[in-house]
Amino acid sequence: MFSKFATRRKFLNCGKLSLLFLLNSCSNLPNKVKIALQNSFYPESFKDAIPKDWKQEKINFESLQLQKNRNAILNSEFTLINDGWISSIDFSEFEKINEYALFENLDKRSIDFLGSFDQNLSSKLFPIGVVPYTIIIKNNKELITSARTSWDFLLSEKLTGKIIFPQSPRIILSIAQKINSSNSLKKLKSQAMLFDDKNMLNWLINSDAIVAIVPYSLCSKYLKIDPRLSLVFPSQGVPLMWHFLLSRSNLNNVILIKWIKSLENKSIVDKLVSHGWYLPFNSDYLQSKYKTEMLPISGPSKKCWENSWSFPVLTLSLIHI
């Protein structure tokens, strides 16, 4: 009788010890790596390429003053941002990304672009993607032919009140500077139907608009559902939108390097490019994606890339380093 109780007591004690060991093991597991990003900025193929065991924290750069957005950034190891929102970020909250293994991956275009920033700022920015703007034309073969060489076609009388522009003065100004006409900015603005960054393609499909100028990465699903739409990348070049990664701690460099290396997988590269997202790295396979001479639907030509342009930060004085 006594031996039965002793055996049962041993069994219960072993069970307690196993439970304590399990709880202790769970408590020692590392927390999930968090990466903050604005969901609407990124194609699904890019979000799918983020490690599955990372937690994607959704933020909105238009509402950075809201505490929930600030908390999401402060509680995340990494943050993704594009060049249009750099001046809204307090860079003192981020660390320098000083890992040579990361920066040796970058191509000449991204290195040159980083060189346009203040050194204290550029040391905290890691280029993770470059997206060319594209012209989408609805049902007009004549305009498509004209658009393939330059931006001058935007001043056509047929397009008065028929163009949807980005809600970005610097993009509109940069395009106006490419147009061979006096008072090109004033004339260009008079062609506008509206200025919009969120629903431009819906407007194009469901209105009398004929042309929209949008980031390539936002186009793919619309091209599949509406055969009236055609993509054009003028050989004169297009504006480029850059995306960067910011880090809150250098303790995660090993994790970060592993992810960056994984993006160079050929199948991932192909998916990203098909959705308008180009990795600014120096591998031969990646660089071949910048040299296409195929139809415009496959992306900018080599000549278009060579003539394309990037934007420096508009207000460095507003950035806290």
Predicted features and spans:
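Periplasmic-binding protein-like
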Residues: 159-168, 262-287
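Ligand-binding pocket segment of bilobal, Venus flytrap-like solute-binding proteins
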Residues: 83-89, 164-236
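A structural signal for short loop-to-beta-strand junctions that line the ligand-binding cleft
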Residues: 78-79, 97-135
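N-terminal secretory signal peptides and thylakoid transit peptides that target proteins
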Residues: 1-20
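Early extracytoplasmic/lumenal segment of secretory-pathway proteins
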Residues: 27-92
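Conserved small/polar residues in nucleotide/adenosyl-binding loops
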Residues: 319-321
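Short beta-strand->loop
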Residues: 97-106, 125, 224-239, 248-249
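A bilobed periplasmic-binding-protein/Venus flytrap-type ligand-binding module shared by bacterial periplasmic
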Residues: 134-142, 240-256, 271-273, 281
